[in-house]
């Protein structure tokens, strides 16, 4: 078989940038690839597969429930839809058909209304929500967040990311307090973050992760959180979620990748330098090239 790079005339990539969507994000380890392959090679009762892998992950992470989705963006859209539909069978099937007389505004700090490769607002709109910005581009306090809430608010959205403004923006714990005071759910997009328990423990009701970034799983996403909300996210499989379906291979691959990720020691700086050193030494043998850690 000719190399894929030759067959399609692709440029070979040495990824020195980390987990970038534009470069193919990550290359899962063999055990994860095996889990993906097992998924591809077998049949399952898919609802059972979704529920039981979700419950297994929830047990590993010590959260109420979890569900594997097709990617973090799909997780945002389906979480928003979940908070608008809230299990109503008519709204589930007619989300975009017309206006529904239920809260649909999603409040987020203005400094979090970013483009992570696609706009956060587009994912909110896909989920049937309307973005309401709180505070200013460079500032959002708990009271500024609260000021944007009204009777039409469905949820608060918090984006935990290097893409966002970091200074003078309230913390996840503070946002959770505002949400609780107003009886609203807090959704946290932690797509590229490394700690799978932190934001849940800080009071978020739903937390969303990208499967191929820190976790180094297949293309997929994880939504974890409070049982009722996760249940409503799962129901979106019969609504907008169908257009962003995750396959059995993605479900089994991510579940195994998370198990491996949690068991793995975090790589130390010294270990990274040790791994880099032979590569750097060989680069330095190339004429005209100077490289250092
Ligand atoms: C990468 C990223 C996403 C999208 O994740 P996908 O799994 O590629 O959909 C969403 N939000 C943030 C902050 C991200 O960094």
Where are these regions (language model features)?
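Conserved PLP-enzyme active-site core in the AAT-like
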Residues: 2-27, 49-57, 62-262, 269, ...
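Metal- or metallocofactor-binding catalytic centers and their adjacent structured scaffolds
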Residues: 30
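N-terminal glycine-/serine-/threonine-rich phosphate-binding loop
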Residues: 42-49
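Shared catalytic-loop signature of beta/alpha-barrel
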Residues: 268-275
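Conserved PLP-binding catalytic core of the aspartate aminotransferase-like
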Residues: 291-293
């Amino acid at each position: 078989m000719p190399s894929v790079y030759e067959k399609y005339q692709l440029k070979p990539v040495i990824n020195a940038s980390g987990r970038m969507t534009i470069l193919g994000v990550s290359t899962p380890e063999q055990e994860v690839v095996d889990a993906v392959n097992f998924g591809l090679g077998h049949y399952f009762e898919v609802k059972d597969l979704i529920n039981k892998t979700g419950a297994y992950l929830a047990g590993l992470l010590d959260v109420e429930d979890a569900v594997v989705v097709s990617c973090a963006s799909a997780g945002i859209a389906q979480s928003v839809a979940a908070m608008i539909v809230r299990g109503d069978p008519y709204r589930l099937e007619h989300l975009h058909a017309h206006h529904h007389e239920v809260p649909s505004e999603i409040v987020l700090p203005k400094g979090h209304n970013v483009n992570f490769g696609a706009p956060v607002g587009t994912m909110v709109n896909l989920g049937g929500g309307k973005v309401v910005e709180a505070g200013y581009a460079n500032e959002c306090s708990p009271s500024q967040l609260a000021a944007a809430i009204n009777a039409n608010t469905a949820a608060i959205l918090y984006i935990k990311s290097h893409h966002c403004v970091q200074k003078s923006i309230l913390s996840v714990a503070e946002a959770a307090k505002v949400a609780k005071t107003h009886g609203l759910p807090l959704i946290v997009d932690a797509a590229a973050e490394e700690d799978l328990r932190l934001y849940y423990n800080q009071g978020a009701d739903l937390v969303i992760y990208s499967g191929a970034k820190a976790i180094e799983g297949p293309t997929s996403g994880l939504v974890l959180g409070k049982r009722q909300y996760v249940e409503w996210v799962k129901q979106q499989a019969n609504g907008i979620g169908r257009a962003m379906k995750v396959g059995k291979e993605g479900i089994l691959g991510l579940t195994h990748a998370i198990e491996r990720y949690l068991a793995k020691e975090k790589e130390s700086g010294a270990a990274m330098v040790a791994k880099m050193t032979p590569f750097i030494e060989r680069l330095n043998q190339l004429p005209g090239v100077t490289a250092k850690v």
